[in-house]
Amino acid sequence: MAIRKLAPVTPGSRFMSYPGFDEITKSEPEKSLLVPVKRTGGRNRAGRITSRHMGGGHKRHYRIIDFKRNKDGVPATVASIEYDPNRSSRIALLHYNDGEKRYILAPKGLKVGEKVESGEKVEIKTGNTMPLKNIPLGTDIHNVEMRAGKGGQIVRSAGAFAVLAAREGDYVTLKLPSGEIRKVRVECRATIGVVGNAEHENIVLGKAGRSRWLGIRPQTRGMAMNPVDHPMGGGEGKSKSGGGRRHPKSPWGQLAKGLKTRNKKKASQKLIVRGRNAK
């Protein structure tokens, strides 16, 4: 996928870039797989902001994605590659031989007309899904389950892939995109290949208005606030943090630079072989 740069006709378009839509083969989504999305603006039912910097944006429909890939033994044909406004990757519409239609994440290199399948003993091919115990070591995978049958939860964004590094007993060892090395049960499923649209990370929004189209509101620096609104607010002029002065903090007083916040008593802690920030 090539990135398309705009001519510097206006200040906003000077550095703006858009993804190329060459791989997209259909402009209208499958209506039977759409559900409406109710926008919250980051508010809970009491009307209070619980997620900051959210609001506005273009109206969207949610595409129901098959993260479980549990339709075993029934081959499917890739009918189209489509744009999904709710995620960074593209999605592929599958037509199964029994007539059912489902969306999946579109891996890199998947073409319209190709066959994909899921099951215990399927071919090692891009787009096929199977348990981790049947995938060869060194294979690039995505849409990985954390619990068998729950559906893929990690490695789902554009250009992401994990590497199957080792297999021992009831667990396999995965190297994740973050750098974390983690164990997962061999019964968990994953899809072969790398998630498509890898150039997404190089896109430049170019102007504030384009963030608003995406539903992202402006972010105010804590130092620019009053003391009542932020631990780093107030002071005469620019009262810097660090160097014996105030340490940077989150709006709720949590130390912001490098403090580990994960609970070490979590049961899944023993499954992390090496953390993502380990040297």
Swiss-Prot record:
What InterPro entries does the annotation carry? NA-bd_OB-fold, Rib_uL2_dom2, Ribosomal_uL2, Ribosomal_uL2_bac/org-type, Ribosomal_uL2_C, Ribosomal_uL2_dom3, Ribosomal_uL2_RNA-bd_dom, Translation_prot_SH3-like_sf
**Segment Disordered: which positions?**
222-279
UniProt-listed Pfam families: Ribosomal_L2 (PF00181), Ribosomal_L2_C (PF03947)
The protein's GO terms of the molecular function aspect are:
rRNA binding; structural constituent of ribosome; transferase activity
Q: Where is the composition biased (Basic residues)?
A: 259-268
Note whether RNA-binding occurs among the keywords.
yes
SMART domains noted in UniProt: Ribosomal_L2 (SM01383), Ribosomal_L2_C (SM01382)
Any one cellular component term from GO for this entry?
Answer: large ribosomal subunit
Family membership, please give it: Belongs to the universal ribosomal protein uL2 family.
Q: What is this protein called?
A: Large ribosomal subunit protein uL2
Gene, per the UniProt record: rplB
